[in-house]
Design a protein with these regions (language model features):
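Conserved alpha-helix/loop element of class I SAM-dependent methyltransferases that forms part
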Residues: 16-36, 46-50
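Class I SAM-dependent methyltransferase SAM/SAH-binding core
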Residues: 38-40, 44-92
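A short acidic, Gly/Pro-enriched loop at the edge of an enzyme's catalytic core
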Residues: 91-103
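A short SAM/SAH-binding and catalytic strip from SAM-dependent methyltransferases
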Residues: 101-115
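Conserved class I S-adenosyl-L-methionine
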Residues: 133-155, 160
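Short alpha-helix
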Residues: 161-177
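Core SAM-dependent methyltransferase catalytic element
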Residues: 185-207
């Protein structure tokens, strides 16, 4: 991990991920989590204030970046919620099979290097009746914006921690063996269109 990724990127991501439009999106999905919860890519812990502590019996936070885990731990203390941290990547989840009731993924799929492998790992640890709550940005539906996304993405990935702009959220989920039960979409207000097309909702493992 280079100097930029270790020391400069974490505070930048912390600020961006704490923006009001993104916070509003988090509030739409995180409170639904219940039981034993696995959050993929906890980052600096921006979801933590929105968990319903009366519904969550155990919270596991997967976050490979040590500086982000430090920020998340501080935020967990402020929120009064316990978190069991693991530094593994989404592709390498080391939890027992069928042990998770809810998976929470917000603004994370865009940075995962091997999405199919991560989807397989996530599905393995989910109980048969478990749900995935997701809120992600991705490929825009209008071609004009999508063209700009494709042009910008090579540079964007280098400065934004490997963030991809052109991943279609619905296709990632269905190709990964999930069935979308509910999904809404919109362009986030106050956000550049190339990074602002959001999809959020709930998915389950396909039969």
């Amino acid at each position: 991990m280079g100097f930029y990724d270790r020391y400069i990127l974490p505070p930048l991501l912390n600020k961006v991920m704490g923006a009001k439009p993104i916070e509003h999106q988090r509030r739409k999905v995180v409170p639904e989590a219940s039981g034993t919860v696995l959050e993929i890519g906890m980052g600096a812990g921006h979801n933590l204030p929105f968990y319903d502590k009366s519904r969550v019996s155990r919270l596991i936070g997967l976050e490979p970046h040590p500086k982000m885990r430090e920020r998340a731990a501080a935020r967990a203390k402020e929120a009064g919620i316990g978190v069991e941290f693991t530094g593994l990547k989404a592709e390498d989840i080391d939890l027992p099979p069928a042990s998770i009731d809810t998976v929470v993924v917000t603004y994370t799929f865009c940075t995962i290097p091997d999405v199919p492998k991560a989807m397989s790992a996530i599905a393995r640890v989910m109980k048969p009746e478990a749900t995935m709550l997701f809120c992600e940005h991705g490929l825009a539906p209008d071609e004009k914006t999508a063209k700009w996304q494709r042009r910008i993405e090579p540079v964007w990935k280098r400065i934004a921690g490997g963030c991809h702009l052109c991943r279609p959220v619905d296709r990632m989920l269905t190709d990964g063996g999930f069935r979308i039960e509910r999904m809404e979409t919109m362009y986030l207000p106050g956000t550049p269109r190339f990074a602002g097309f959001n999809s959020w909702g709930k998915a389950v493992k396909a039969a």
